[in-house]
């Protein structure tokens, strides 16, 4: 995470857009900076977020002790510090000391603890802030893609999908497009689960029995959702250009196309 954060904040243009506050260890950050041979970058060390310098990258120390680092290897202390950083950022978010949180990558294995028993950030934030209806949404300049089932093994996706769950995710996506992206009447494309959208039941019946009924019900509520579309043909024909957002059934299928379109 530190490598990504440091290299990102080296871009001085970002400091003109927002005041950056990193929650972590200044000593660990310094170690990474030296290991990367980055000499033209330093964090402004502050005790609290409200002391942040508006024109410099700031860091709030959540741990000031010496830490033995072995770059590229997972350690328990790394997971502990990642959780401490996340908790400190959430606390400041609640207190309105900061306006938003951007999460850097975590090791989802070494962060597991009594305070974090989640498959990812999305589920942690949902529990932390009491959100029953939430959605993982990946956004690029050209596409917005939401995910119904999020972080879970592919083997569990089929049994997790329900008409009610898909309806909830479509509704959350519709609300987000209107509120966060100021789109008055958003158009949402819903992707199929099975190849060729099930091929009339030959390759699976989730499209006919679960996904299509969910789309029809939200459409009756004036939500402009369409589908289900086979993912390969949908993206291959660039049909995503005709919609404001896309809802995929599972994580990797959605993220795969987001990455392709971003590159």
For the regions a protein language model found, what residue spans apply to each?
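Contiguous, glycine/small-aliphatic-enriched amphipathic segments in soluble metabolic enzymes
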Residues: 1-120, 164-249, 253-254, 259
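Flexible loop/hinge segments that line or gate small-molecule binding clefts
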Residues: 116-145, 150-154
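Active-site glycine-rich loop that binds ribose-phosphate moieties when present
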Residues: 123-132, 154-178
């Amino acid at each position: 995470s530190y490598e990504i954060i440091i290299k990102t904040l080296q871009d001085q243009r970002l400091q003109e857009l927002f005041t950056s506050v990193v929650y972590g260890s200044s000593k660990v950050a310094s170690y990474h900076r030296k290991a990367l041979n980055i000499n033209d970058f330093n964090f402004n060390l502050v005790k609290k977020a409200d002391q942040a310098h508006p024109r410099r990258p700031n860091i709030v120390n959540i741990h000031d002790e010496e830490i033995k680092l072995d770059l590229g290897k997972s350690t328990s202390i790394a997971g502990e510090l990642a959780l401490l950083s996340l908790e400190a950022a959430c606390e400041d978010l609640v207190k309105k000391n900061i306006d938003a949180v951007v999460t850097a990558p975590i090791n989802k294995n070494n962060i597991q603890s009594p305070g974090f028993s989640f498959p990812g950030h999305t589920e942690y934030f949902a529990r932390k802030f009491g959100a029953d209806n939430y959605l993982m949404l990946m956004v690029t300049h050209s596409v917005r893609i939401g995910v119904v089932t999020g972080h879970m093994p592919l083997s569990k996706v089929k049994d997790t999908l329900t008409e009610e769950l898909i309806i909830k995710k479509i509704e959350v996506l519709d609300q987000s497009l209107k509120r966060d992206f100021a789109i008055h009447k958003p158009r949402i494309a819903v992707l199929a689960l099975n190849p060729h959208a099930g091929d009339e039941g030959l390759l699976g019946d989730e499209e006919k029995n679960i996904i299509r009924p969910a789309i029809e019900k939200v459409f009756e509520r004036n939500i402009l959702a369409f589908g289900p579309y086979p993912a390969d043909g949908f993206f291959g024909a660039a049909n995503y250009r005709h919609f404001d957002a896309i809802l995929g059934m599972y994580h990797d299928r959605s993220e795969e196309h987001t990455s392709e379109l971003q590159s």
